[in-house]
């Protein structure tokens, strides 16, 4: 009996340790009470093959509310073996389900998903505000565009056409558009849900399957929305969501031989690295990268309207916008007038709690981003830029920065050349059209530009000459689901939204049929 007891003791300890691991394992869903008082259930597991699961290595990370610096919840962290499992599920779903269903089935699922986003729009907007720090004003705008874009993608699903090609009477020749397969998608933290829709929408419409990595700082909305995919009728394995680091999940997706395409939105430096890694397996790559966009104000513009557009162009979403109009060029004859108007308008903007309905600018997304922005303030001052307003942290808790204007800058200053990704704008003066075009184009980036003038001939001329993928005239940060968006130069490759986005997710096959008896 004694020997039996001794022999059983190790097994008892193993059993006890197993129980401890089981009960200490982080949950796959948690109830969260939003700052507006509403409670919802937040998925916290990896979403693989239609289920929320713990990561194989049981690693987790905390998600922080940028507005109060407090922990929201803990989320499972994917590693390489989780990526492999998700890719295998996506590959199987592609081969056996999604690529072979009738296009109208994919269309209906995307329409359903758009409807579900609308149904849960207030919850999704609140999740974005809590997780990202953006104001509800911004978050609601994001969610509205998400549903519109998913519906647009649904409309394209049964309109992916090939061509019949005249190659003479001895052959019948045609081309068809086919999906690629498993698509790896890596989205940023500034527009989590919007970028989720920009990535999965065209991929699903064209018959591909997806393994998507949200940013570590903002994974919650993508996880919540993944369960809406199930409800919409999208089969298991078609959409997989893997919270985790870029160095692990992003790297593995970019290198994985069964991933046929990578779509990335983020920094130019990371985009370059992804291209290098993806080149080993010759993947199709689309990149939406950084920007340092010019916003030009001519003397004949409606100056009050121009000032509002300038502010919206740089301070919207706390300045965390890839196409933010961060370089302002004002014609010399109205320079001081516009600068004063901009100062007054900037100081009227309310900064603070994202759930305050009167707040325009919420928090920066992370402590890291907050200090990066404040470091650029110090750099600008040291280089001799004139601080007009802002230039400091707002409050003592939360990652808030006062909207900041620097004037009288020189074109070789770092604050003019480098992407800050925050609520900081530089202001310069110009005299002639040729002068401002030269300054506007003196950048490695080419994502967007703004032009403010009441002279339509001048507007068209300048829009042709400025090197940017999107040009806004007498408006800024004005998006539509059917208008392609993407950059020139080191701002990226490929286009998001509109018909142009679909080509990123298809490949062309040509078919020639020999005709024994010539067709007459």
Swiss-Prot record:
Keywords: Mitochondrion, NAD, NADP, Oxidoreductase, Transit peptide. Residues 1-23 form a transit peptide. It is an enzyme of class 1 (oxidoreductase). The record marks 190 as: Transition state stabilizer. It is found in: Mitochondrion matrix. The keyword NAD applies. Pathway: Alcohol metabolism; ethanol degradation; acetate from ethanol: step 2/2. GO terms for biological process: acetate biosynthetic process; ethanol catabolic process. The activity increases in the presence of K(+) ions: 15-fold with NADP and 40-fold with NAD, respectively. Its EC number is 1.2.1.-, 1.2.1.4. GO terms for molecular function: acetaldehyde dehydrogenase (NADP+) activity; aldehyde dehydrogenase (NAD+) activity; aldehyde dehydrogenase [NAD(P)+] activity. Its main location: mitochondrion. GO terms for cellular component: mitochondrial matrix; mitochondrion. CDD domains: ALDH_F1-2_Ald2-like. The active site is at residues 288, 322. NAD(+) binds at residues 266-271. The keyword NAD applies. It catalyses: acetaldehyde + NADP(+) + H2O = acetate + NADPH + 2 H(+); propanal + NADP(+) + H2O = propanoate + NADPH + 2 H(+); propanal + NAD(+) + H2O = propanoate + NADH + 2 H(+). Gene3D superfamilies: Aldehyde Dehydrogenase, Chain A, domain 1 (3.40.605.10), Aldehyde Dehydrogenase, Chain A, domain 2 (3.40.309.10). InterPro entries: Ald_DH/histidinol_DH (IPR016161), Ald_DH_C (IPR016163), Ald_DH_CS_CYS (IPR016160), Ald_DH_CS_GLU (IPR029510), Ald_DH_N (IPR016162), Aldehyde_DH_dom (IPR015590). PROSITE patterns: ALDEHYDE_DEHYDR_CYS (PS00070), ALDEHYDE_DEHYDR_GLU (PS00687). Belongs to the aldehyde dehydrogenase family. Present with 23300 molecules/cell in log phase SD medium. Minor mitochondrial aldehyde dehydrogenase isoform. Plays a role in regulation or biosynthesis of electron transport chain components. Involved in the biosynthesis of acetate during anaerobic growth on glucose. This is Aldehyde dehydrogenase 5, mitochondrial. It comes from Saccharomyces cerevisiae (strain ATCC 204508 / S288c) (Baker's yeast).
